[in-house]
Amino acid sequence: MASQYSVRKVGAPYTLEHRVYIEKDGVPVSPFHDIPLYANAEQTILNMVVEIPRWTNAKQEISKEELLNPIKQDTKKGKLRFVRNCFPHKGYLWNYGAFPQTWEDPNSIHPETKAKGDNDPLDVCEIGELVGYTGQVKQVKVLGVMALLDEEETDWKVIVIDVNDPLAPKLNDVEDVERHLPGLIRATNEWFRIYKIPDGKPENQFAFTGECKNKTYAMDVVRECNEAWERLITGKTAPGGVSTTNVTVQHSSSRVAPDQLPPLPPNENLPPAPIDSSIDKWFFISGASA
């Protein structure tokens, strides 16, 4: 499947000004609202938006608040956020991103995790062999899901693989991941458990004692979050600070014609700004398994 999507990069990476906009056939679109969740009629292949390529550290995410929801680097107290390297890991273990047209509703408490949603699109870990790029739209299939409890919020992590990956035909459920990629599920659990410790935070907790639930459970989570997004985009749920402006969702009162949007800055494709060498430091966490 050739991608219809391209990226427009504004500002230099690793700066507060950096934004990655998504365009479809040259028209700016929202990666949150305009890219369809499902890539085929059978709803077995899904679109994901890559925010953070594997082995990188910059914590980039779809901006919920900004017009057209560009991808930007997250900040804390005005400083750009980077995840630390917890031995033996380097940056993120997977191509990390989000499912479009999904939302973890902060007004809703999940009956099994007993925690509310985290007010973000659904997080996705793509485990294929190719390193993606920020703003890439991949076609993936769902394999399983973990439920991280992050500061008393449910933060689902859906495990997927690019349908074009050589291993994709062999991976159809979570037990196939363990069979063909032994250790990856355990390492994924460990990574999410410890990654905030170098920043002085406690280790994260999981629902289901850290178990990775199977594909059927994961697809139910995806559907629930898609339904929550439907309520958001149609105004049945108050958006809070979320920008719901879009150019394609016919039944949304926030839809605008592309020519009504303010012009975006031109594509710049600037070299990355220098980052502090401490980002490369390895942190050794007691209780982490090598």
Swiss-Prot record:
The UniProt family comment states: Belongs to the PPase family.
Name the domain of life.
Eukaryota
**Which gene is annotated as encoding this protein in its UniProt record?**
ipp-1
From the Swiss-Prot or TrEMBL record, give the protein name. Inorganic pyrophosphatase
Q: Where does Mg(2+) 2 bind?
A: 123
Q: Known PROSITE patterns for this protein?
A: PPASE
Q: Which GO terms describe its molecular function?
A: inorganic diphosphate phosphatase activity; magnesium ion binding
Q: What organism is recorded for this protein?
A: Neurospora crassa (strain ATCC 24698 / 74-OR23-1A / CBS 708.71 / DSM 1257 / FGSC 987)
One GO CC annotation: cytoplasm
